[in-house]
């Protein structure tokens, strides 16, 4: 009788534990796949086999800096810079050949139309290349050469204005006037290209990267609940009473 009662209590405890498992434990929530779209500038971690988290190898590029750079029409500005550089090289060569002993032209003696024209051509070519190939290296190279072109145009304008005061050669003054107009134009073009290049570089530097842990878990094992120990029994044997005859 005691053995039957102990077995009944053990079965009732097991049924109670099973009912708690059925009502208390919930299935894991649905997890979205990692192939869903992510906004630019977000890098997601993946868990390796050893449990360590490692970032993905690729990151979506941020196109906002390049859009800022393209607002300034770098291809058109670069084309004009190349033409101005060619004009400087051509007019400088003509002045060098026909000056006929007219000394005192610092613009020619210092080779301003040659190194200035070469600088204008290089900066214009890099601006056109940066619009065709959207790379950070070309963007920074275009920015650096445009800064140099602006400095060269400013120095060339100052030298041309100085030559106007010391040159009495009428033909030379005509060439200097044309070169002054194109040099001032190159200065403003280089400043505009530098402005948009600085904005694009600043936007590229300030682009934030957000690190998100991987949404997948590697262990879906549900811990088994603790089973209560069976009840204690007294060491008393039940002896049925013999029936009297």
UniProtKB/Swiss-Prot annotation:
Keywords for this protein: Membrane, Receptor, Transmembrane, Transmembrane helix
Localization (cell): Membrane
One GO location term (cellular component): membrane
Residues annotated as transmembrane: 78-98, 103-123, 147-167, 176-196
Region: Disordered, residue numbers: 1-30
Membrane topology, from the record: Multi-pass membrane protein
InterPro entries for the chain: CD20-like, MS4A
Described purpose of this protein according to its UniProt entry: May be involved in signal transduction as a component of a multimeric receptor complex.
Family designation: Belongs to the MS4A family.
Protein name: Membrane-spanning 4-domains subfamily A member 15
